Regions:
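Conserved helix/coil segment N-terminal to the catalytic DExD/H
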Residues: 54-61
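ATP-dependent carboxylate-amine ligase
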Residues: 120, 157, 177-190, 194, ...
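Acidic, Mg2+-coordinating active-site environments of NTP-dependent enzymes
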Residues: 39-43, 66-216, 291-298
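Single conserved hydrophobic/aromatic residue that forms the stacking wall/gate
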Residues: 1-9, 271
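Inter-motif core of Ras-like GTPase G domains
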Residues: 62-72, 239-244
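Switch II (G3) loop of P-loop NTPases
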Residues: 43-53, 216-222
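N-terminal phosphate/diphosphate-binding loop that engages ATP/GTP or pyrophosphate donors
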Residues: 6-23
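Conserved nucleotide-sensing/catalytic segment adjacent to the nucleotide-binding pocket
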Residues: 19-48
């Protein structure tokens, strides 16, 4: 089935063509122009990420979605350039369920009831708790060289054994969400199980082979909630050391810097603070804010402003059994400095570092 896609990677996929986009959720006229192109390309379904900003600015007004999905919510995107308060953020998210036919929601998230207040759609839920319509039971971790994953039993509206080559409770939730959605498309169970077993998403717990001794991965975790989630998950696999490398974006809330610093300081054995997208701020000033959060903990840290040098330090000092997380950039292939997006892909940086270390 031909499909269309609009997502956080700021791209649109129309049939087999990938088209760059400026926003996660484009302006309304662009959305409908894209829909028209998708119809012309023979697309039968569209999967679209609808951001809180997109809902706030009515970019999706007039669209009735067949399925709307709510995964989770924590304070984020709050500031002078985004939402004035968490209440505004939540209320904007909730607008989605006033313009969809079926709402699929995470039964375990503490904000689900508020998100569904005023909803006009039929509601189905997924989760780990007993009150979910589709739930995961008997979760078991899988860990062997070059592989971090888990298995669980899916029960309720869908019953099957699930295996994932991805770690963590959040991967359980993500897969349950996918199962809940695909139920409405009559997807073959064996095809679904095989897809879940091998699914990989660029920049999301993306394993990169650098050594036979330790594990390195790239992940888009760019706020405290996401960082805490992945670090807590990885600690369950009992690494020799958990090493976290990250920075924070410029011209965004300083609270995020303090919170991420504190989270990494508490959970990681070593934090390597570096640059992310400094935008119009000085990278060193952002690093100092992150260190303010780390100072609330007893966590060890080093700060290396240049991201490539920081990655080199992480690889060069990797110890047997370590898990190293490069957090924050994920799928991004640029670094934004003073209004200019310079090419920068962590996969390329890793390759360059390995070549340099090999040459030495």
């Amino acid at each position: 089935m031909s499909r269309g896609l609009g997502d956080v990677y700021k791209r649109q996929i129309i049939g087999d063509e990938a088209v760059p986009a400026h926003n996660t959720t484009p302006e309304s006229i662009e959305i409908h122009q894209s829909f028209a192109k998708m119809v012309d390309a023979g697309c039968k379904a569209v999967v679209m990420e609808v951001s809180s900003q997109g809902l706030k600015l009515d970019r999706t007004a007039g669209i009735m979605f067949d399925i709307g999905v709510f995964t989770n919510l924590e304070p984020d995107h709050i500031g002078p350039n985004e939402h004035e308060s968490f209440e505004d953020y939540l209320n904007c998210k909730a607008k989605l369920f006033k313009q969809c036919k079926v709402g699929i929601v995470n039964a375990d998230d503490k904000h689900t009831k508020d998100i569904l207040r005023g909803a006009i759609c039929k509601v189905e839920s997924y989760g780990i708790g007993d009150n979910a319509d589709i739930k995961a039971e008997n979760i078991e971790l899988l860990h062997e060289p070059g592989k971090i994953g888990l298995t669980y039993d899916c029960t309720g509206l869908v019953n099957m054994k699930v295996e994932l080559n991805l770690p963590g409770k959040f991967s359980v939730y993500n897969s349950l969400c996918a199962i809940a959605i695909t139920r409405h498309f009559d997807v073959d169970e064996e095809a679904l199980k095989e897809t879940l077993k091998h699914v990989k998403v660029k920049g999301r717990i993306e394993l990169v082979k650098v050594s036979d001794d330790f594990t390195l991965m790239i992940d888009y975790a760019h706020n405290a909630m996401a960082l805490e989630s992945i670090l807590t998950t990885l600690k369950e696999y009992h690494p020799h050391r958990l090493v976290c490398l990250f920075g924070c974006g410029g011209n965004r809330s300083k609270e995020r810097r303090y919170e991420m610093g504190e989270v990494s300081g508490k959970l990681a054995d070593l934090t390597i603070i570096t640059s992310d997208n400094p935008r119009f701020e000085e990278p060193e000033a952002i690093i100092e804010d992150i260190k303010t959060g780390i100072a609330k903990t007893t966590g060890k840290h080093v700060d290396i402003t240049d991201r490539k040098e920081a990655i080199k330090y992480a690889i060069e000092h990797g110890e047997p059994g370590d898990i190293i997380v490069l957090a924050g950039k994920g799928h991004e292939d640029y670094q934004e400095i003073k209004g200019v997006k310079y090419p920068m892909d962590e996969r390329v940086l890793i390759k360059e570092v390995l070549e340099e270390l090999k040459g030495n």
